[in-house]
Amino acid sequence: MPYANPAQRIGKWKGEILSRAIPVEVLQIAGVQKAMPKNVSNTVVYRRWVPYNADKTTGVTNGVIPESTNGSRLIADRTANETAAANIVTTMLAGGAAASLLTEGTTPTADTMVAQDVTVTLAQYGCLYSFTDVQSDLGEDDIEDALKTQVAERIALVRELELYSKVRAATNQYFVNGSAINTINTSLTLNVLRKVARGLANNHAKKQTAILAPSANIGTKPIEAAYLVFCHTDIEADLRNTTNFPGYTPVAEYGSRKPLHENEIGSIESFRFIASPELVPYANGGAAAATYTAFETSGGTGINVYPVVVTGQEAYGTVALRGSNAFDLSVIPVGTKDKSDPLGQKGYVGAKFYASSAVLNQQWMAVIFTGASKL
């Protein structure tokens, strides 16, 4: 009796685990990081002393270009704001210095310092995954280990997005055109960045980085002390457009080769750019996509609008619970029996952490709203 070849029992070869997208954290590097002790409170209060002759509400020094009442700086209002600022300076020079003159034998009136507080309340975040004994006992992959990695990456993403939600809502706003998000119809320009630099400098914002000197290597360039700029990866192509950004220097041409982050992409004038796919745009939030077809859209009626975050030192901060700066990982392996799972058929992997963030000084950072060119 002839025998046929037996069919394969499995007929599949176990390949390697494929790489996957890993969330990127970039915003943390520019923030003031504070660890709160346990068993104290869920609230942190940051305090600054308002400088002499400064606005007690905003902390802006007199003579500095003021913000508009709704928190948005309209580019069209620039001349009027500068004129107002110049008038304030004239008044300060005439009265401020004179007010500090002393009269012989007369005790001057004592001034008082004014505090400005920024309150941050910790929030608790977490995630939980489950798996079964069948997956653990019979599956060819280490499901528990894979879930641990997934949890760590998810927590990192949550932490980045929580911070991003705060900084992109900063009130010192610039628009590449128009005066609102839904009017955006063009890409980022060097002139808008220069306006931001001027505003930050007038508000005494300190730059985040020092000057980098060129090296002996061919083609390297010096890099100025700079504000940090965080943007979506879709913006990179516009930055490399030499027509709009003459003098843009990619990281490969840094003389001393000291990128601030693995996602740093380049610099121009007093800005260094760090790009991340997590810094998502307002999808379809801009002008009509059918009219402005040269710009990225998510398939809706409007073009995508990208917040570009520009920051000096101590503009925003993050708070974590001390001892839980990363996260508290929890693992319940399969086989753990209790009244809710008497046969120990389920396992769990999860994590929780406490964190929050806040803008500490609105005048030391800015958000530019822009479109991104299609390729």
Question: Where would I find each of the regions flagged by the language model?
Answer:
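N-terminal "assembly arms/tails" that initiate or stabilize quaternary assembly
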Residues: 1-120, 365, 370
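Sequence/fold signature of self-assembling virion shell proteins
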Residues: 2-30, 183-208, 226, 234-375
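Structured, hydrophobic secondary-structure cores that serve as assembly/anchoring elements
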Residues: 123-125, 129-139, 143, 211-241
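Alpha-helical scaffold segments that mediate packing/assembly in large oligomeric complexes
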Residues: 138-213
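Surface-exposed intrinsically disordered loops and tails
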Residues: 61, 65-103, 107, 173-186, ...
